């Protein structure tokens, strides 16, 4: 399939929730990706795990192969030894405490918002401060937390309780903090 045919396939069958670059990526290795036309590209895109771990590291590929041969997915209704061992490793090498596993940045941010509300609910704190130009995800709460009007279009009214302040404006940040702010 050509690059243009793949792009047309997406136009016909995939919701356009991202502005995509006109490249079809077919391979990755380390910090590089290759497109369908054979161009080698240094992958410097932020926000996704591959930016931190690279593409197709042999140890990661082997670990995935091994696990896929045993069990691909287990619902959180059940226990999983690898998940338990990962939680232990993260806790012991990080800040201690317990882990919250999730599948995306939006889910992580949504979880953080809920945790902040839960932790501060007895003090009647329910507001959140986010910075203008931020991006927090595509769930309802994280779209609301995203202080960019272009992401709000079509989803109004947004959830209440979000305050937007300019980046690097300490006075605006201080002014936004009230007794109702959870995070």
Predicted regions and their residues:
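Gly/Ser/Thr-rich beta-alpha loop segments that engage phosphate groups in nucleotides
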Residues: 30-32, 49, 54-56, 107, ...
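PLP-dependent aspartate aminotransferase-fold enzymes
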Residues: 87-183
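A non-catalytic, amphipathic alpha-helix used as a structural packing/dimerization or gating element
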Residues: 5, 9, 63-66, 85, ...
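Short secondary-structure boundary/capping elements
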Residues: 25, 56, 82, 165-168
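Active-site and channel-lining beta-strand-loop segments
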Residues: 23-44
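Active-site-adjacent loop/helix segments that line or gate small-molecule/cofactor pockets in enzymes
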Residues: 1-29
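Glycine-rich loop-to-alpha-helix module at the N-terminal edge of alpha/beta enzyme cores
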Residues: 12, 40-125, 129
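Short acidic-hydrophobic sequence patches enriched in Asp/Glu that either
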Residues: 2, 56, 60, 82, ...
């Amino acid at each position: 399939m050509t690059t243009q045919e793949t792009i047309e396939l997406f136009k016909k069958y995939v919701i356009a929730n991202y502005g995509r670059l006109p490249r079809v990526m077919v391979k990755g290795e380390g910090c590089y990706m290759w497109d369908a036309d054979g161009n080698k590209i240094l992958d410097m895109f932020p926000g996704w795990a591959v930016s931190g771990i690279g593409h197709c590291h042999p140890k990661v590929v082997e670990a995935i192969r091994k696990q896929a041969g045993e069990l691909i997915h287990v619902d959180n209704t059940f226990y999983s030894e690898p998940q338990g061992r990962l939680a232990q490793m993260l806790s012991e090498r990080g800040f201690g405490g317990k882990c919250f596993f999730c599948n995306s940045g939006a889910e992580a941010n949504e979880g953080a918002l809920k945790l902040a509300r839960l932790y501060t609910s007895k003090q009647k704190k329910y507001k959140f401060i986010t910075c203008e130009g931020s991006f927090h995800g595509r769930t309802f709460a994280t779209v609301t937390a995203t202080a960019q009007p272009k992401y709000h279009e079509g989803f109004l009214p947004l959830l209440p309780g979000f305050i937007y302040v300019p980046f690097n404006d300490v006075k605006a940040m201080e002014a936004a903090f009230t007794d109702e702010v959870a995070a």
